[in-house]
Amino acid sequence: MSYFGTDGIRGKFGQMPITPEFALKLGFAAGKVLKRTSPKNKPLVVLGKDTRLSGYILESALQAGLNAAGVYVHLLGPLPTPAIAHLTRALHAHAGIVISASHNPYFDNGIKFFSSEGKKLPDSLQEEINKELEKDLFIEDTANLGKSVRVTDANGRYIEFCKSTFPYHFDLNNLKIVVDCAHGAAYSVGPSVFRELGAKVVALYNEPDGLNINENCGSTHPESLQKAVVEHGADLGIAFDGDADRVVMVDKFGSLIDGDHILYILATQAKNKPAGVVGTVMSNMALEVALEKANVGFVRAKVGDRYVLQALEENGWVTGGEPSGHILTLDKSTTGDAIIAALQVLTVMVEQNKALHELVHDFKLYPQVLVNVRLEQMLDPYSIPALVAEFNKAEEQLKGRGRILIRKSGTEPVIRVMVEGDNEQEVKTLAEHLANAVRSQAQVA
């Protein structure tokens, strides 16, 4: 069986495969594969994590397995996922490993790998690790074990890297920024980056206790940030998720600036406009229309930063992302980086001398309605001619003014019916009509 999903290995801590025993075996299996594929006799792996309590247990197990396989490990401590990607390259490591479940609650955790280039591990290497996991853990040579050391300046290295992506002749001296750290991996480095560039920073949710990561805070719960920006009279707010690979922002009036807004700013307001942008099937149609008017290319990928990255590489572009706040700027970083994405927006604000709300003044998201249709048993909506006819009819009705998206959930018997368009009432009516059509056909089936 394959333990790897689209974003590494993830699950509830204490249940397979997120257990100390499995992490030990995984470290050993990965170490064996890295030794075979490494030009060095003793390959180096950098290992970082977010702030979950279970991360410390998994870290100990992983490093023990890696050391037993003869791999040297540099322990980075709690740091954003993109920081691990950067330090994998900066420290000339053969691979990087992150222990994190991103925006999930504290009781979940995950393990994912980066290649020596700071990119997601190739599928071929993941398959080799899977095969190695089927073997017994057997230490052949006790004279050639690896060892682990803690990197004491990891935070500083990453802070300097982030600052290097912000124009050296710019500063943030006149800005007051509220930063929501989600009690996560950016709790220290996030506020530090903006302070060192001159901003007055109000840090929120920056006291992790191992259990409060993402709890009613961060990019998935920006409500308290929206309130805090107004209360503090700040110029803007920035919210990360637990591992700081997602970011959403808030203007001085408390309005939310999501991933679609950020892509709009980077694609149409920046001094150097990109040739094209990659969104996903969830990107609002308003973004597609705005980019077309600005003569900026646009393509949609499947949901997931892995697919956004793939589409960027296929098109030779550097800018892409998702409404959730996964933003990739491949000319700055190899993976989605919340701090760097925020800095790119701040760069546009400084170079144009405009407030955040002014940058999106002409950009209005189309009304969007999402209806989750729960079924007794999953069905494929596109295998039923009557439903396909309804979908086609709806698409024809919205032609040029909106769109529909019908998706099956990958984890539960739910059909997601999404409709968006330029008329809110029409969108609501159409979404409910299509949802009812799915319900009716499910009863017939």
From Swiss-Prot:
The active site is at S102. Mg(2+) binds at S102, D241, D243, D245. Its cofactor is Mg(2+). It catalyses: alpha-D-glucosamine 1-phosphate = D-glucosamine 6-phosphate. Its EC number is 5.4.2.10. Keywords: Isomerase, Magnesium, Metal-binding, Phosphoprotein. Coiled coil: none annotated. Activated by phosphorylation. GO terms for molecular function: magnesium ion binding; phosphoglucosamine mutase activity; phosphomannomutase activity. It holds the Pfam family PGM_PMM_III. One of its GO terms (biological process) is peptidoglycan biosynthetic process. It comes from the Bacteria. Catalyzes the conversion of glucosamine-6-phosphate to glucosamine-1-phosphate. Belongs to the phosphohexose mutase family. This is Phosphoglucosamine mutase. It comes from Acinetobacter baumannii (strain ACICU). The gene is glmM.
